Amino acid sequence: MARAVGIDLGTTNSVVAVLEGGEPTVIANAEGARTTPSVVAFAKNGEVLVGEIAKRQAVTNVERTIRSVKRHMGTDWKTHIDGKDFTPQQISAFVLQKLKRDAEAYLGEEVTDAVITVPAYFSDAERQATKDAGKIAGLNVLRIINEPTSAALAYHLEKEGEATILVFDLGGGTFDVSLLDVGDGVVEVKATHGDNHLGGDDWDQAVVDWLVERFKSSNGIDLSKDKMAMQRLREAAEKAKIELSSSTETSINLPYITASAEGPLHLDEKLTRAEFQRLTSHLLERTKGPFFQVIKDAGISVDQIDHVVLVGGSTRMPAVVDLVRELTGGKEPNKGVNPDEVVAVGAALQAGVLKGDVKDVLLLDVTPLSLGIETKGGVFTKLIERNTAIPTKRSEIFTTAEDNQPSVQIQVYQGEREIAKYNKKLGVFDLTGIPPAPRGVPQIEVTFDIDANGIVNVTAKDLGTGKEQSVTITGGSALPKEDIERMIREAEEYAEQDRKRREEAETRNNAESLVYQTEKVISENEDKIPEDVKNETKEALDGLKKALEGSDIEAIRSASEKVALASQKIGSAIYSQSQQASGAAAGGQQNAEDAEVVDAEIVDEEPKREGNS
């Protein structure tokens, strides 16, 4: 049975893990790193670059490099490249495809099944978009699970007894805080809250804004209008943020950042940890609201928290650690987990649970936001309250607002506001064919069904006629089935193009190596190669060099074969010469040995003569 992987599809970085012998293992990518930047770029030749290679070329290819696309999941955002529109699902699928390839290279087998994690506070539309991304990448998404739940599973699996765990998850682009009860193989989420637009990217942006302001006041030039300069500033800001986690001061030095009439200008600033914390204090403040809301929703006090687990690279910032310590009444956050990897490890464990490889583990997750419909007066009527354990199903009876109303429109929302329009609209559908009747008479049963992925199915049924209409809510930004199928085909085409490009690069590299090696052999063995063989080989080499100047891969292959055949003749000639030389040497050596024997006899007798006289 093929193994399933666990994937943490992050805003900034992504990680893939797998169970080996019952133990979770983080899989290193093709570049040897355990995390892969969630960056996708389109090279000028159309090649799709993913990960570190895409991140490295971002400065010189700003317009065609996409990062932090997770922040656009579940929206109608698109990027236009080479005459094509790419959705967040497609861009995420490129990242997932790379993780899939790296896992297959590591395991030596095809990978199709995966558990993918999402922020706990992701809406239905964002969850569905993540599932679609997996499908486009050629993955069968076994389950979408919440990142804090996954982290708690990884953290507590080997521990004994029951405990209440607070997971504080601050990633590159999203923030969640969750309270979970764990024990006896059960991981139960009590409450969750968060902010899907708060993360390390915002800390970076605060530093970028500060640098732009400083440079403007010093030089009178606004760098925010220069896309290439802004990309360099973003990279420098991220580096400075990371350095300030272990140092109290860092230098930001960017030579030739721009130019004025007088010549090139350089950026050189010092940033202290204290100044960095002042610049970003408003961001830290935004994490407090969700924390207090979770404590309130779970109905516990801070002193009932047994363990605090920090998740996400942004929790390495000292100010974040200090704040968590302060909020939890002085509790020391656990240092035993890797904040970058723990979510993927938990996802691999959940994949093992679903495949039957891990026994006696049960995840009880919750829906992060209330679900309901719009009723008369624009009121949001909740059918399922937030923090309800999933999977779940709830029904309620509604009626018509007008006499002889032939249909009702069901507008589905997700959120906490009392007025429907202020919440996130997930979808709309109509129940038609209601028989004429006075208002208030028809009975329409609306049922919400949330599956274990947190994805919603809504059914409206006229109890009088038995007529029913249902829809799987996938959000206003959801992709139609035919679009997903088209994107799957396109992803496969890109993968095929990439495979061809890799083959072409290998063919070209092998050909160049063959030229070098063959010329080296000729130069080192000039006297041993017959003139006709030498001329034939040089002619073949000239043909290969000419082919390498062009782009016809078949011509390069054909020319390489000719050089290889000619090289074999060189090898035969050298081998033949060596054999003749060694044969002659062996004959000469035999004569020498015979002569030595005769000499030895004479020399041996000489002393006897001397001794007798």
UniProtKB/Swiss-Prot annotation:
Modified residues (Phosphothreonine): T174
Family: Belongs to the heat shock protein 70 family.
Gene3D superfamilies: 1.20.1270.10, 3.30.420.40, Actin, Chain A, domain 4 (3.90.640.10), Substrate Binding Domain Of DNAk, Chain A, domain 1 (2.60.34.10)
Function (record text): Acts as a chaperone.
Basic and acidic residues bias spans: 495-509, 521-535
InterPro entries per record: ATPase_NBD (IPR043129), Chaperone_DnaK (IPR012725), Heat_shock_70_CS (IPR018181), HSP70_C_sf (IPR029048), HSP70_peptide-bd_sf (IPR029047), Hsp_70_fam (IPR013126)
Organism: Thermobifida fusca (strain YX)
Feature: compositional bias, Low complexity: 575-592
Compositionally biased residues, Acidic residues: 593-604
Induction or repression: By stress conditions e.g. heat shock.
Source taxon at top rank: Bacteria
Keyword annotations from UniProtKB, A to Z: ATP-binding, Chaperone, Nucleotide-binding, Phosphoprotein, Stress response
Molecular function via GO: ATP binding; ATP-dependent protein folding chaperone; unfolded protein binding
UniProt keyword Cell inner membrane, yes or no: no
Keyword Phosphoprotein annotated: yes
Region (Disordered): 495-535, 575-613
Coiled coil: none
The name this protein goes by in its record: Chaperone protein DnaK
